[in-house]
A protein has these predicted regions:
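Generic helix N-cap/helix-start motif at coil->alpha-helix transitions
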Residues: 2-8, 37-42, 75-82, 110-116, ...
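Internal metal/ion-chelating core segments
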Residues: 64-164
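A conserved active-site cap/scaffold subdomain adjacent to cofactor or substrate pockets
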Residues: 149, 154-220, 233
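Alpha-helical repeat scaffolds
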Residues: 1, 22-32, 58-73, 95-106, ...
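Residue at a conserved register position within TPR or TPR-like alpha-solenoid repeats
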Residues: 15, 49-52, 89, 122-123, ...
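Short coil/turn linking the two alpha-helices of tandem helical-hairpin repeats
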Residues: 17-20, 46-57, 86, 92-93, ...
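C-terminal non-catalytic interaction modules
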Residues: 198, 266, 272-344
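Hydrophobic alpha-helical hairpins/lids featuring a short glycine-rich hinge
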Residues: 9-54
Length: 344
């Protein structure tokens, strides 16, 4: 017969596999009360793509930190726990604490791609772009392209290449390591990383051919035909808007589901307005979303797209001072370099 722990394993896993994410999240909490060091179950609620990250709940970043803080006393010097705690800390702005924990995690397991990825986020949040690119590129070049994080780590390299002015390298990384044609990564990463890098490039004033957007729109329709995962849907909305695939975009607006469907519909409509150069209507929708876009899940770095989109809409209206004020409060990194065209 199964032990109580094994029965709980099966129950939690069954809920997750059946798509009952809210129930699975609650079941994880119950499981780790009794067996806190059961990493297979605990990890379901960790990181920005986990059951807390994609819960759609207001305050989910604080909940993520609380979850990891409560687990930590049971793990001692375990590198995995320190890395996950560091990620939760840096996402709420506890950068010094995150730095201590991620360095300790890397000392214990210097070969962890997950820990290196978290260290890259710390470089990003500390505005250390050149140092971050140098650090990550050394490790990325020796990382197996079939690795689970290869696609996303490539995105960080490509993004930093863009932000440090190396466009040739950005396109090389995008085409060979991120885009659907060549990536071995999970579809969620392939779509979101490709869309994000292309749109961030456009926001910075780099020309992106319509063919790139049309190809990615076709990929999004194949892999994410039915709206439901808000983080994927808002990247698909960008893609469909830029590709001129209005039917697919309107499908997201009409049929968005899940815990962030309210935000998804607003963002999708905002990108439709952007495509029509209706900057005022787009900026009004983005303004209503930015204060709670953490509900989408993903990292601060990934959701910069939304803050930068609002700024771009304001700039197009001649409201540059407002754009600068908002970014100074929300994402001051945008003021450091020319990463939004027309801001300076």
């Amino acid at each position: 017969s199964l032990s109580a722990r094994e029965q709980s394993h099966l129950s939690v896993s069954s809920l997750l596999l059946r798509g009952k994410s809210a129930e699975a999240r609650a079941a994880v909490y119950e499981h780790v009360k009794e067996w806190p060091c059961d990493v297979l179950i605990a990890q379901m609620c960790t990181s920005v793509f986990g059951l807390i990250g994609f819960s759609g709940l207001p305050g989910r970043e604080a909940e993520q930190l609380s979850f990891m803080t409560n687990l930590t006393p049971n793990y001692g010097d375990d590198w995995w726990c320190k890395a996950q705690l560091a990620f939760a800390q840096l996402e709420v702005g506890q950068l010094d604490e995150a730095g201590i924990n991620i360095e300790e995690a890397l000392l214990s397991n210097p070969n962890s791609a997950h820990s290196k990825h978290i260290r890259a986020h710390l470089y990003y949040e500390n505005l250390q772009d050149e140092d971050g690119l140098s650090y990550l590129q050394r490790h990325w070049e020796n990382y197996d392209p079939s690795g689970a994080l290869y696609n996303h780590i490539s995105w960080h390299v490509g993004l930093w290449s863009l932000e440090t002015g190396n466009l040739e390298q950005m396109w090389n990384v995008l085409d060979k390591h991120i885009s659907p044609d060549n990536s071995q990564g999970p579809p969620l990463n392939v779509l979101t990383d490709t869309a994000a890098l292309l749109f961030r490039a456009e926001l910075a004033g780099v020309e992106v051919t319509p063919e790139r957007w049309r190809d990615l729109s076709a990929y999004a329709m194949t892999k994410f035909a039915n709206p439901g995962l808000g983080f994927a849907d808002f990247h698909a909305a960008i893609t469909h808007a830029r590709a001129g695939n209005i039917e697919a975009l309107e499908n997201i607006i009409a049929n968005a589901k899940g815990p962030v469907s309210d935000l998804t519909k607003k963002v999708a409509r905002a990108y439709l307005y952007m495509q029509d150069a209706n900057w005022l209507s787009a900026s009004e929708l983005f303004t209503s979303v930015v204060r709670e876009h953490a509900r989408f899940g993903g990292s601060n770095a990934q959701r910069d797209l939304l803050d930068f989109s609002l700024a771009a809409c304001l700039i197009h209206q001649g409201r540059k001072r407002e754009a600068k004020t908002i970014l100074a409060i929300t994402r001051p990194r945008a003021l450091q370099k020319d990463i939004i065209s027309g801001l300076h």
